[in-house]
Amino acid sequence: MKQYTTPEQTAKLIELGFERPKNTVYTQVAKRNIGYGIVEWEDAGEEGSYSIGELIEMLPDYINGNFVNWEIHTTRGDVKWSVGWDCFETGQFQWIRRTELVNALYEMILKLKEEGVI
């Protein structure tokens, strides 16, 4: 089972205003050795990804003063994970089903962010 978001998913969440993942590290790579053991460094940028736990922490406990019901289910067949939440507009549960839990949570966060819930 995948435990972390992809670099593309991570970049999208950061772009949407979420804090950088806790396991983000700033790295530098050696560009060239300029002699006498001195190395010139070049910034390689930031790496990191969100864990399943960090994605769950992004989800709100309350929407408009109402406690939010979140559900995570395992399913049979090719689609292994199903995440759902109360939709106060329709009064029904909405579901996202994916083979990886991290992908289902990521898509749920995008949907809620798009709707202005988080």
Task: Name each region found by the language model.
Residues Q94-I118:
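Ampiphathic alpha-helical segments that act as solvent-exposed interaction surfaces
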Residues M1-N33:
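Extreme N-terminal leader/activation tails
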